[in-house]
UniProtKB/Swiss-Prot annotation:
Binding positions for IMP per the UniProt entry: T30, G31, G32, T33, R60, V61, K62, T63, D122, I123
Alphabetically ordered keywords of this record: Cytoplasm, Hydrolase, Multifunctional enzyme, Purine biosynthesis, Transferase
Chain's role: Bifunctional enzyme that catalyzes the last two steps of purine biosynthesis. Acts as a transformylase that incorporates a formyl group to the AMP analog AICAR (5-amino-1-(5-phospho-beta-D-ribosyl)imidazole-4-carboxamide) to produce the intermediate formyl-AICAR (FAICAR). Also catalyzes the cyclization of FAICAR to IMP.
Pfam families: AICARFT_IMPCHas, MGS
Active-site residues from the entry: K134, H295
Origin: domain of life: Eukaryota
Family: Belongs to the PurH family.
Biological source species: Dictyostelium discoideum
PANTHER family noted in UniProt: BIFUNCTIONAL PURINE BIOSYNTHESIS PROTEIN ATIC, BIFUNCTIONAL PURINE BIOSYNTHESIS PROTEIN PURH
Lineage: Eukaryota, Amoebozoa, Evosea, Eumycetozoa, Dictyostelia
MGS-like domain mapped to chain residues: 1-143
Descriptive protein name: Bifunctional purine biosynthesis protein purH
GO cellular component, one term: phagocytic vesicle
Record-listed 5-amino-1-(5-phospho-beta-D-ribosyl)imidazole-4-carboxamide binding positions: R236, Y237, H295, G327, E350, N446, R466, F491, R538
Length: 542
């Protein structure tokens, strides 16, 4: 009986190999794996001794040989297969233990060159996986070190000296083969994504459109898109209790999928969706910000002049809609302080997200048993996530480049805006318009955002027509609406929303423009003396 072992991740390989050796397996290995086994007192046959060819081309060719792959692919029940093995002096290989070069870890480093990435594309190991998995009825393929323990126990307890593998059922071998194929598939997907450069936006690209939210990114979508996600854990249930769900993460990235849970119960499906919305919203701002999220929509958001205002920023965000804040998700883009923790502790929240927490703030918040406290360091960075937006649809998927973050100071960020009315906004109104426009990107369309002093006053989200969203804002905002500014994520098709804005004493309006009735809308704004600005860009969010 023969076992071939060639692993990059050597965790547990020595202990597992000792079990195989004790059961009479001839251990075949190569390179660093062979050295590790020999150093631990195991007898190993080098692959080069089996193939009668040395490793060559800087190790690129090791196991690619008929004496290896013939031993993996032969079917013992076929007489002509056995005849070929005998003719060419090839011995069957019953167990293959392989895991691949760390391609994802390598290319996740910014300093990695193309040449370094290419050298980390595994050829021999990948081929071993495919050959062994194809013949899973006769070959046991192991790619996951976590499987060593149970397989080792089965082999060790086997009483059939002529067929040790009979202790592993055919169904179990099939599952191991499936895991191996998935391991190889995810590896190929990582290589494909790297080589095709399907990072639709990156820091350099976004800086290239600084001061605008025009997604003028030169993107050529690939003919075949292979998303790479690895299962992190099962979730209690999905969006509703009768739905099953699991969380998958994209290796080498941050975000909500890789958040560190410091305290509280496991995240639910809905917690993760809301947490992701909170993270995206606070990363929109380069100053101290706090957002309150409910069902992926902001119901409160505010920014401060400096970081020392964090507690006050939270209070302003909360007061945007105190009723909706209950049971919501909080997001911060600065380390959460004790003062802020004290201010929010009396309100029930499901989740808090921050780049970090002071020791005393974490201790205080941890007294709330059901509160989930997440650390996401990149929440403090105003850097665009590089993953494309992916939406599954029946029979396919949609990909798009992300709606980029708006960067720069007031002048830079609004340099392409156009005042279209007789009256012009004041500088403070322009600050509030920019704030509201940034927020509108994170509100479900049709979206209307009212703000004052860079704080949300009211939000109208997800309505089938725009005037309904405006009307909701007026009712939710109440007396606070007077003197606030209004942002609309898309153009006004009719002047009725301007009439409603006037009734609510709205001070100023920002919208993309582009309607065939733009002039009617402008005329209505001029009629009421309301300054209005066109951005030239739309912020739909479906």
């Amino acid at each position: 009986m023969q076992a071939l072992l060639s692993v990059y991740n050597k965790s547990g390989i020595v202990e597992f190999s000792k079990i195989l050796s004790s059961k009479g397996f001839n251990l075949i290995s190569t390179g660093g794996t062979a050295k590790s086994l020999v150093d631990n007192g195991l007898k190993v046959q080098q692959v080069s001794d089996v193939t009668e060819y040395p490793e060559m081309l800087d190790g690129r060719v090791k196991t690619l040989h008929p004496k290896i792959h013939g031993g993996l692919l032969a079917r013992p029940e076929l007489a002509h297969h056995q005849a070929d093995l005998n003719k060419y002096n090839i011995k069957p290989i019953s167990i293959v233990v392989v895991n691949l070069y760390p391609f994802v870890e390598t290319v996740s480093k910014e300093s990695t060159t193309l040449e370094e990435a290419i050298e980390n594309i595994d050829i021999g190991g990948h081929t071993l996986i495919r050959a062994s998995s194809k013949n899973f009825q006769n070959v046991l393929i192991i790619v996951d070190p976590s499987d060593y323990k149970w397989i080792g126990e089965r082999i060790q307890s086997s009483t059939d000296s002529t067929n040790v593998l009979s202790s592993i059922t055919l169904e179990e071998r099939k599952k191991l083969a499936l895991k191996a194929f998935q391991h190889g598939c995810s590896y190929d997907a990582a290589v494909s994504q790297y080589l095709s450069k399907v990072e639709l936006t990156n820091a350099t690209t976004i800086q290239g459109v600084k001061g605008t939210d025009s997604a003028s990114v030169n993107v050529e979508f690939p003919q075949t898109f292979l998303p790479l996600y690895e299962k992190k854990n099962d979730l209690r249930y999905g969006e509703n209790p009768h739905q099953k769900a699991a969380l998958y993460q994209c290796p080498g990235t941050g975000g909500i999928a890789n958040a560190q849970l410091l305290h509280g119960p496991a995240l639910s499906y809905n917690n993760i969706l809301d947490g992701d919305a909170a993270l995206k919203a606070v990363r929109e701002f380069d100053r101290c910000a706090c957002v309150v999220i409910k069902h992926t929509n902001p119901c409160g958001l505010s920014v401060g002049v400096n970081d020392s205002e964090q507690a006050e920023v939270y209070k302003r965000a909360f007061n945007g809609d105190p009723k909706s804040a209950y049971g919501g998700i909080l997001g911060f883009n600065r380390t959460l302080t004790l003062e802020t923790a004290t201010a929010l502790k009396s309100v029930f929240y499901e989740v808090i997200i921050a780049p970090d927490y002071t020791e005393d703030a974490l201790a205080l918040l941890s007294k709330k048993e059901k509160l989930r406290i997440l650390r996401i360091p990149e929440a403090a960075n105003q850097i665009q996530f590089t993953q494309p937006d992916i939406r599954t649809i029946t029979g396919g998927a949609l990909l798009q480049s992300p709606n980029p973050i708006i960067r720069g100071d007031l002048a830079e960020a609004t340099k392409n805006w156009k005042v279209v009315t007789e009256n012009k906004p004041t500088e403070q109104q322009m600050k509030d318009l920019l704030f509201a426009w940034r927020v509108s990107k994170h509100v479900k369309s049709n979206a209307i955002v009212l703000s004052k002093d860079e704080t949300i006053v009211a939000i109208g989200a997800g309505q089938p027509n725009r005037s309904q969203s405006v009307d909701i804002c007026m009712k939710v905002g109440g007396d606070k609406v007077k003197g606030s500014v209004l942002a609309s994520d898309a153009f006004f098709p009719f002047a009725d929303s301007i009439d409603l804005a006037h009734q609510g004493n709205i001070a100023c309006i920002v919208q993309p423009g582009g309607s065939i009735r733009d002039q009617e809308v402008i005329d209505a704004a001029n009629k009421y003396g309301i300054p209005m600005v066109f951005t030239g860009n739309r912020n739909f969010l479906h």
